From Swiss-Prot:
Keywords linked to the UniProt accession: Chaperone, Cytoplasm, Nickel insertion
Gene: ureF2
HAMAP family: UreF
InterPro entries in UniProt: UreF, UreF_sf
Protein family per UniProt: Belongs to the UreF family.
Subcellular location: Cytoplasm
Protein's UniProt name: Urease accessory protein UreF 2
A GO CC term assigned to this protein in UniProt: cytoplasm
Cited function: Required for maturation of urease via the functional incorporation of the urease nickel metallocenter.
Amino acid sequence: MTMRTATITEFSSSYRSLPGLLHLLQFGDSALPIGGFSFSNGLESAIQQNLVHDKETLREFTLTAMNQAATSDGIALLTAHRAARADDRGALQVIDKAVFERKLNEETRLMTVRMGRKLCELSASIIDDRLNRDWLECIKTAETPGTHPVSLGLAFVALDVDGRDAFGAQQYGVATTILGAALRLMRVSFMDTQKILLEATSTVAPAYEEIADAGIEDMASFAPMVDILAAVHVKGHVRMFMN
C-alpha cells in the first residue's frame, strides 16, 4: 500500500484557510449577539395568515426569502465588500443608503439598521480594524443608516473572508433565522427544518453566480407579499417577534 505524504505547501494552504472558515462559522452563527433572534423575516405574519402552515409551505417560504435576499441584501453585501477592500468610504455610504431606501416598510428598516449597528459595534470591539471603527462613528453620528449587509461586508473584509463566502454566510443567516423562528411558531420538527436547511444551502452557489458581478443599481427587492405581511404585523395584537 502506498502512503501519500502531504507536502509543506499543502499543510500551509490548509492552515491559511482554517481561520477564514472559523470566522465564517462565528459570524454566520444565528447565536451571534446582534439581535437576529428577535426577527422572523415575515414568518410570524405568514403563519398567522395561514400562508405557512406545514413543512412544505415553510420550505417554499424559506427558499423565496433567500432568493429575495440574494438580489437585494446579497448584492449590497458584495458591493460593500468590494468598496471596503478599496477603502472607498463614499461608495459605502451610497450603498448603505440604497439598502435602507429599498426597505419599504418600517419593520424591515428597523431590522436592518438594528442588526447592522449591533454587528458594527461587535466588529469594532473585537476586530483590530480602523474602517470598522470609523464606520461605527458614522452610524453614531447619523451620517449613514448602518444597514446589516454593509456592516457584514466590512466585518468580513477585516477578517480577510472573500466575497463568495461572505455571501454564503449571509444566505445561511436568512435561512436559519426563518427556520429557527418556525420551531417556536408552528408544529414542525428539528428533522423537518434541517432537511429544509440542507436543500436551501444547495441553492446558494447558483445564486452567487447570478449576482457575483452585479452593481448596486442591480439591487431588486420586489416582494409585495413580504411588505403586506409586514404591514399586517405592525398592527398585530399578539407578537412574539419584532418583524
